A protein has these predicted regions:
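A short, structured surface patch at a secondary-structure boundary
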Residues: 44-101, 105-111
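Ligand-binding pocket segment of bilobal, Venus flytrap-like solute-binding proteins
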Residues: 205-206, 217, 223-246
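Short helix-initiation/N-cap motifs at beta->coil->alpha
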Residues: 28, 84-96, 219-228
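N-terminal signal peptide c-region/cleavage motif recognized by signal peptidases
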Residues: 17-20
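Bacterial N-terminal signal peptides that target proteins for export
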Residues: 1-9
């Protein structure tokens, strides 16, 4: 952790010092990447990473995307320039198509096998990964270095301060909670098949920051397939259904899970979803922490106005004047009204 903090501090200092015409950057896997100039035409092969570029005010630099309007309607509404971007089929771009579009940097998720072909095409390729708050902040600073504008630098630092402030505000209310007062939360990423998010993930981080305990903490990693019998053994106090996973009532497990504590006490929640699902790997995790804290400890966060917080975030970091009704739909995990 100390090493990560030192690296983040070094990144922050380099950002405030200005951006050189050419630079050698270090991606999230520790690989050195040469950039001849600040990126102006970016391909993004990691679904979640788009929200980082948008937070930096650089969403309009994305000229190739793995996201699609049908899957991420809020993303394309808030950042309409994505409609003109090259849209990948699946997770893979043609290197030739990227070169033809003049792409000068591409972000890929860690362990993406296509990174090899992008590098062979001489496209600066940065492998990105974060699984907690500290590494998210580091990734944002690295992304700002790639963009290389004073605005991106300022916004990266501003977002990181904002995230720290939200965490501090929530922690002030939850720090005194005993272990017994922290509900056991099961986060279900998929109902068909049944997949959950466990420890050593960003999901586990926001559960704990919001004053909960991960019911699946004995398992590590994202989107782990489990048996319904294991869920019954865990018997969580709260179940959070990930955006796009459907409803528990309409799932094959409705009857089987009817005896769970969370179901009997009506504490099965649908997660909000905006530019990206709040519960996953994007900058809206700052809002997710607030939302989760209010769901887990409503009395302690009775005065927290989630609609106001959501609207303020979208205006500040996405430059989008979100209406009240739009914020309500995002909080309910609903897409924008078409038309």
């Amino acid at each position: 952790m100390k090493t990560l903090l030192r690296a983040s501090l070094a990144l922050a200092l380099s950002l405030t010092a200005g951006v050189a015409a050419a630079a050698t950057l270090t991606d999230d896997l520790g690989q050195q990447v040469e950039l001849s100039h600040p990126a102006r035409r970016i391909a993004d092969a990691w679904y979640a990473h788009h929200s980082l570029l948008m937070t930096l005010g650089a969403g309009d630099l994305i000229v190739a995307t793995v996201n699609h309007p049908a899957d991420r309607p809020w993303m394309f509404k808030v950042q309409p320039s994505l409609n003109q971007a090259l849209q990948a089929r699946g997770k893979t771009f043609s290197s030739e198509a990227l070169v033809a579009r003049g792409v000068d940097a591409i972000f890929v998720p860690a362990q993406d096998p296509d990174a090899i072909s992008y590098r062979q095409a001489a496209i600066p390729t940065l492998s990105m990964r974060f699984d907690d708050v500290a590494s998210l902040k580091r990734s944002l600073l690295t992304t700002a270095q790639v963009v290389g504008t004073p605005q991106a630098q300022r916004r990266a630092l501003a977002y990181n301060r904002y995230l720290d402030t939200q965490i501090a505000a929530v922690s002030a209310q939850t720090a005194s909670l005993s272990e017994a007062q922290r509900p056991r939360v099961l986060h279900i990423q998929s109902l068909r098949p049944l997949k959950i998010d466990c420890s050593q993930t960003l999901i586990d981080s926001w559960i704990r920051l919001a004053g909960g305990r991960n019911a699946a903490a004995e398992v590590t990693g994202n989107m782990k397939e489990v048996s319904p019998e294991q869920v019954i053994v865990w018997d969580p106090d709260v179940i959070i259904i990930g955006a796009g996973a459907g409803s528990l009532e309409a799932s094959p497990y409705a009857a089987l899970f009817s005896g769970l504590k969370a179901v009997k006490q009506h504490r099965v929640l649908q997660n909000p979803s905006g530019v990206f699902p709040w519960d996953r790997y994007g900058t809206e995790v700052a809002l997710q922490i607030l939302w989760a804290a209010k769901q887990l400890h409503p009395q302690r966060f009775a005065r927290l106005d989630l609609i106001a917080a959501t609207r303020g975030f979208y205006q500040r970091f996405y430059d989008y004047p979100l209406r009240v009704d739009e914020a309500e739909r995002i909080l309910a995990g609903l897409p924008p009204i078409s038309g």
